[in-house]
Amino acid sequence: MAGNDWLNSYLEAILDVGPGLDDAKSSLLLRERGRFSPTRYFVEEVIGFDETDLYRSWVRASSSRSPQERNTRLENMCWRIWNLARQKKQLESEAVQRVNKRRLERERGRREATADMSEDLSEGERGDPVSDVSTHGGGDSVKSRLPRISSADAMETWVNSQKGKKLYIVLISIHGLIRGENMELGRDSDTGGQVKYVVELARALGSMPGVYRVDLLTRQVSSPDVDWSYGEPTEMLAPRNTDEFGDDMGESSGAYIIRIPFGPRNKYIPKEELWPYIPEFVDGAMGHIIQMSKALGEQIGSGHAVWPVAIHGHYADAGDSAALLSGALNVPMIFTGHSLGRDKLEQLLKQGRLSTDEINSTYKIMRRIEAEELALDGTEIVITSTRQEIEEQWRLYNGFDPVLERKIRARIRRNVSCYGRYMPRMSVIPPGMEFHHIAPLDGDIETEPEGILDHPAPQDPPIWSEIMRFFSNPRKPVILALARPDPKKNITTLVKAFGECRPLRELANLTLIMGNRDGIDEMSSTSSSVLLSVLKLIDKYDLYGQVAYPKHHKQSDVPDIYRLAAKTKGVFINPAFIEPFGLTLIEAAAYGLPMVATKNGGPVDIHRVLDNGLLIDPHDEKSIADALLKLVSNKQLWAKCRQNGLKNIHLFSWPEHCKTYLSKIATCKPRHPQWQRSEDGGESSESEESPGDSLRDIQDLSLNLKFSLDGERSGDSGNDNSLDPDGNATDRTTKLENAVLSWSKGISKDTRRGGATEKSGQNSNASKFPPLRSRNRLFVIAVDCDTTSGLLEMIKLIFEAAGEERAEGSVGFILSTSLTISEIQSFLISGGLSPNDFDAYICNSGSDLYYPSLNSEDRLFVGDLYFHSHIEYRWGGEGLRKTLIRWASSITDKKSENNEQIVSPAEQLSTDYCYAFNVRKAGMAPPLKELRKLMRIQALRCHPIYCQNGTRLNVIPVLASRSQALRYLYVRWGFELSKMVVFVGECGDTDYEGLVGGLHKSVILKGVGSRAISQLHNNRNYPLSDVMPLDSPNIVQATEGSSSADIQALLEKVGYHKG
């Protein structure tokens, strides 16, 4: 291409580069349109790039003096614009394809689930799935979405009804800097509105009647870069109003921030880097909850542990943690997403600036999404701030389908079987707000003496003068925006709208409170980029003296900032592209500020209730400017919006929020560990050796106990909590009682024989059942070897490394594997090992737990009486099994002559809580993420695991795993995780990541299980490095071919000392 001078004039024509026309010379069309520019619309909306960025590129391209070089630069720029526009179209096409694919998958899964659930209904009962659902779910009114506070009498009645209850509630929010006073909101992207929300929620719940204690668990940060207060283990949250509900205070009652140490000890890191340390947090949090439950039991539980009535996770990382804690402790879980990963991914892809890989690398977005999916699997209730979050964001997830959710809910109301399908309930509960510190304005600008804001009085808040110093005319109304400098907050569009509208500039000032900063160079790249863009726009539109952007403010200054804007008859604006809720809008309304807010997200619901402002399209500068101008120029409208806000603000209060919150918790089916523990950590049952308390407890839990060695299922289980259709409950109970009586007699006959505990000089604890309770340390062998001979070699190596401690009995061993108990028996016999060489056997990938029998003549192993009741939450039973078999039959080798089936059921290997499948061609089996997606779309909750180098698939309960089984041993028997050493290979089964990380020590044996890296882990949603804390001091790696002496040296390195 030659002679590109025309490009310069073309770009000059479509860019606003020259001096603006004054109103007298501008065309009537432009004046009527409010300076609407068709060319700018083309640049920013059609091409999809900011005019300022394009102008900057054009200036650089045309700055060369050489005509030939300038032509070349302009040509390259045009090709770049063309390529970017083409890329944008490609991204839009890919987005449409993703939506269509998701819709087809959802519809297919919905059809299959509905067909399965319709098997037991007559033709007249089935009806149309959607119409059947609508009669039970939809049509929520505004009142049902945003419950209004009751009258004083109704509230008093409710308070009286809660007296006598003493609930323990656990909240989790692990990222950011959290403290009760002087919160550093806006310091970074992790310390924002969520921090304030969880602190105020904990404080408000702690003041409610019927709530004895609230713990807000977060990360302990002892970094020199942050204040010392973030390193304090415990901080009490004093109630705002001690007169509220303080009549039943006790020794440990109230609300507390509990800081759990995990991750790098002396470093404050962003939330994207916390993922590998989640297991360590879970272990630490579990220790605190168990300790606190025991302490509360002594105070208010008559000696019985008081377990949390719910564990509430906030954001994806805490949702992942809450799900693991809920499974380990067997208590209900609640989840609040705050900001959702799938929605963020869609927004970033639409921008077209980053590829999926780049997004995942920067934000760890796939790990975040999987955590949110796991939270949906484990939670009873999802609490949202708005209906929009449910309808437009949560429906993007495989684990939630609004139509299927209403269908399942309708069947539950009719007491009809759901065939193992579960869906969390979505509840809209707007965040509350504290009103104690809000005082009405003590004056109005119209009644103040002249110049009151030009020369602030000494008693005026210091932040006022800090803002006013920016303005040449401080008496004008203040347009206030309070948000951190984040692209999604859309501050630059607000500044453009202000700069483009001359009437607005003449009538008002703009105040931007964009967090705290010392220097622009010290800010994160994203934040500094936004701030620089704002400063350049201020310079471009010559807004000096009209825009304030103070560098610092304290949290205590925020009320004064609102008061200043209200005193000047200003407006509060939230122009974010999408606002999950918009708590600042409620705060502003409480101070008498009308609002202008985005029409995307929570502000729609807030505006519907408060009716105190206008909604705008955040992408439309003219819409923003017009709304602001309308409010600041029309005093009657301003006064009406102000009055509406003040009149209706009481609809958003913490007491009402907590009342609704507690009523939702009350609907959760109570779950907690079923056994009772004595003070010394033992069982409080009649027999010290018995792991169970009584047959009555077993019968109440409807446990399907299994004491056989063949590993076969003893009957169908866990259909969906419905009654036995064959009416065989009596026969089943009789079989259970006979089995337990026989087992108990076997225990009483003899003490443990063989192994290290044969010695008569053993301490008195040796007779305890199971033997692991008497150990000082536990070695957990969870090595997923390629062959059984390799596993035997590793076991003997670890036995040898234990040395004298094994002979003395101070160290016990646990075998953790995907094998069934019958396969383990065969393996032990062939390897010349005794069942008593191990204190426990975690079988079937963590779905079964056995101990060596004290009477080995009668039977070699006995199952834990309570383990299945602990892990059976949302187990799909027969409904899940049928769906899995149908899925397996569809996986065939299309290249073979007879469409050979790749995945087939392994009935002889399956148990009540583990459905096993043989995989003939591991390389051709679908990746696990596809199976998880399929099950979630059909509302089936499970944990599929490829094991034994991909030749077997085990499907177990959703919150069960080998790592969770170790946590169960801690909860059940009190054996501390920090005293466990877990041996794993270089890689292993697809649950491998859960075994590395946590409070236990981990020894990675290089060269063992390495084949699984390519066989099983290539098709992961996220790399292992995103979830494995290889820099943890609790993890050491043994070189290939290490000897027992090498392993002993590694154990000393991680702090393991003999004795």
From Swiss-Prot:
Leader sequence segment: none
Q: Name one Pfam family in it.
A: Glycos_transf_1
Q: Where is this region: Disordered?
A: 95-145, 671-695, 710-731, 748-769
Sequence ranges of Basic and acidic residues compositional bias = 102-114
Biased amino acid composition, Acidic residues? 681-691
Keyword annotations for this protein? Answer: Glycosyltransferase, Transferase
The UniProt activity regulation field reads: Activity is regulated by phosphorylation and moderated by concentration of metabolites and light.
Catalysis performed (reactions): beta-D-fructose 6-phosphate + UDP-alpha-D-glucose = sucrose 6(F)-phosphate + UDP + H(+)
What would be an example GO MF term here? sucrose-phosphate synthase activity
A biological process from GO: sucrose biosynthetic process
Per the record, the pathway is: Glycan biosynthesis; sucrose biosynthesis; sucrose from D-fructose 6-phosphate and UDP-alpha-D-glucose: step 1/2
Database matches in NCBIfam families: sucrsPsyn_pln (TIGR02468)
What is known about what this protein does?
Plays a role in photosynthetic sucrose synthesis by catalyzing the rate-limiting step of sucrose biosynthesis from UDP-glucose and fructose- 6-phosphate. Involved in the regulation of carbon partitioning in the leaves of plants. May regulate the synthesis of sucrose and therefore play a major role as a limiting factor in the export of photoassimilates out of the leaf. Plays a role for sucrose availability that is essential for plant growth and fiber elongation.
Describe the family membership recorded for this protein in Swiss-Prot or TrEMBL: Belongs to the glycosyltransferase 1 family.
Quaternary state and interactors:
Homodimer or homotetramer.
What is the designated name of this protein? Answer: Probable sucrose-phosphate synthase
